[in-house]
C-alpha cells in the first residue's frame, strides 16, 4: 500500500522553493562608505528593498537598527562581491580619504581595492573629484555623480535655499524683507534661491554673465545684473549669495562691500570667494557646504534613495 509522506514536496512547494533560491542568488550587496545625516534616511530606504544586503563602513558610532544591514570595516569588505558602492556626496579627497561623520576611524579608498570591483559594479558619489576621475571613471565602471543629475540637483536646491535663509537670519541684524540680496549665478540652486528670497520680500539682484540667465531674471521680476558690472553696484548689497564655482568675489569686489554685509558662498570647494581677504576686511564670509544635510537630512536622504534605487 502506498502511504503519502509529508517529506515529499508538492509541485507548488518545489516551485516556491526554487523561486526563493533564485531570489537569494539575485541579492545585491551594496556598500555605503561614510556619509552624513542624509545617509541615515538613505540606508533606511534601501533596506525596504528585499533584494539588497547593505554593508556599512564608517557608521560605528551608530546603531542603525535596520534589518539586512551589517557594519563592517574596510578590511572586511570584499570588493569582488559588490553590486554598488555609495560614497559621500563630497566624494573623496586627493588621497582617497572618505568623509565620515559617524566614525573617528579613517576610511581610505585604495587603488588596488577599486581595481577589484567587478565591471558590473556601480559607484555612486555626489560630485566627481580628481581621485575618482582618475581611478574609478577611467576604469569604465558605471560611475554616477548624483549631483550632476538635474532632477536631484533641483530637488536638493530647496533645502539649500532654505538653509541660506536660515543663515541669513542668523548672521544679519536686518529683515530679509527690503534687504538688498545679490545672488550670483542662476543655475539650479540660484534659481530656487531667487524665488525664495523674492517671496520673502527681498530686493533681489540676479548676477550672471549669461544673457539667457539675465533675461530669465528679468522675467522672474528681479533685477538682472551682468557679472562684469558687479563691482559698480556691490556697495549696495546687504547679503551676497554665491552659487558660481569660480572666483567671482575677489579683493576688488569685497573691498567695495559694506562692513555689515554678509557673504554666503554655496559653491562647492574651494568656493568663489577670497575668504582670506574677506576676513582681513572684516566682512563675514561663510562657506556654507552641505546645507541639505544640515537643514533637512530626512528629505534629502529620501531624494537620494529614490534616485539610487531607480538605477540599481
Regions found by a protein language model. Give the residues of each.
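Glycine/serine-rich phosphate-binding loop and adjoining beta1-alpha1 elements at the start
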Residues: 25, 84-178, 307
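Glycine-rich adenosine-cofactor-binding loop
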Residues: 30-40, 177-197
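NAD(P)-binding Rossmann-fold cofactor-contacting core
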Residues: 51-66, 202-220
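Short acidic-hydrophobic, aromatic-tinged amphipathic segments that line or gate anion-handling sites
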Residues: 70-76, 224-228
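Rossmann-like adenosine-cofactor binding region
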Residues: 90, 108-116, 220-293
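Short, Lys/Arg-enriched N-terminal segments with co-localized hydrophobic residues
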Residues: 11-23
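Rossmann-fold NAD(P)-binding glycine/threonine-rich loop
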Residues: 127-143, 267-295, 299-308
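Residues in the short beta-alpha loop(s) of Rossmann-like NAD(P)-binding domains
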Residues: 36, 58-60, 129, 209-210, ...
Amino acid at each position: 500500500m502506498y502511504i503519502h509522506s509529508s517529506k515529499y514536496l508538492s509541485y507548488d512547494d518545489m516551485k516556491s522553493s526554487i523561486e526563493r533560491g533564485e531570489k537569494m542568488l539575485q541579492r545585491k550587496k551594496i556598500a555605503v562608505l561614510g556619509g552624513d545625516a542624509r545617509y541615515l534616511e538613505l540606508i533606511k530606504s534601501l533596506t525596504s528593498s528585499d533584494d539588497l544586503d547593505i554593508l556599512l563602513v564608517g557608521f560605528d558610532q551608530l546603531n542603525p537598527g535596520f534589518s539586512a544591514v551589517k557594519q563592517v570595516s574596510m578590511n572586511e569588505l570584499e570588493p569582488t562581491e559588490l553590486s554598488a558602492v555609495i560614497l559621500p556626496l563630497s566624494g573623496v579627497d586627493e588621497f582617497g580619504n572618505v568623509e565620515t561623520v559617524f566614525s573617528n576611524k579613517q576610511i581610505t579608498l585604495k587603488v588596488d581595492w577599486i581595481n577589484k570591483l567587478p565591471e558590473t559594479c556601480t559607484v555612486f558619489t555626489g560630485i566627481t573629484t580628481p581621485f575618482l576621475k582618475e581611478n574609478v571613471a577611467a576604469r569604465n565602471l558605471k560611475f554616477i555623480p548624483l549631483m550632476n543629475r538635474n532632477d536631484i540637483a533641483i530637488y536638493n536646491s530647496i533645502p539649500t535655499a532654505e538653509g541660506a535663509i536660515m543663515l541669513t537670519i542668523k548672521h544679519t541684524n536686518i529683515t530679509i524683507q527690503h534687504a538688498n540680496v545679490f545672488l550670483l549665478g542662476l543655475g539650479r540652486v540660484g534659481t530656487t534661491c531667487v524665488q525664495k528670497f523674492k517671496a520673502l520680500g527681498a530686493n533681489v539682484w540676479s548676477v550672471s554673465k549669461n544673457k539667457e540667465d539675465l533675461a530669465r531674471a528679468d522675467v522672474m521680476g528681479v533685477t538682472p545684473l551682468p557679472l562684469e558690472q558687479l563691482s559698480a553696484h556691490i556697495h549696495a548689497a546687504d547679503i551676497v549669495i554665491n552659487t558660481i564655482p569660480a572666483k567671482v568675489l575677489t579683493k576688488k569686489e569685497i573691498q567695495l562691500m559694506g562692513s555689515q554685509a554678509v557673504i554666503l558662498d554655496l559653491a562647492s570647494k574651494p568656493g568663489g570667494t577670497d575668504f582670506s581677504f574677506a576676513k582681513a576686511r572684516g566682512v563675514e564670509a561663510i562657506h556654507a557646504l552641505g546645507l541639505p544635510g544640515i537643514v533637512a537630512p530626512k528629505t534629502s536622504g529620501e531624494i537620494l534613495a529614490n534616485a539610487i534605487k531607480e538605477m540599481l
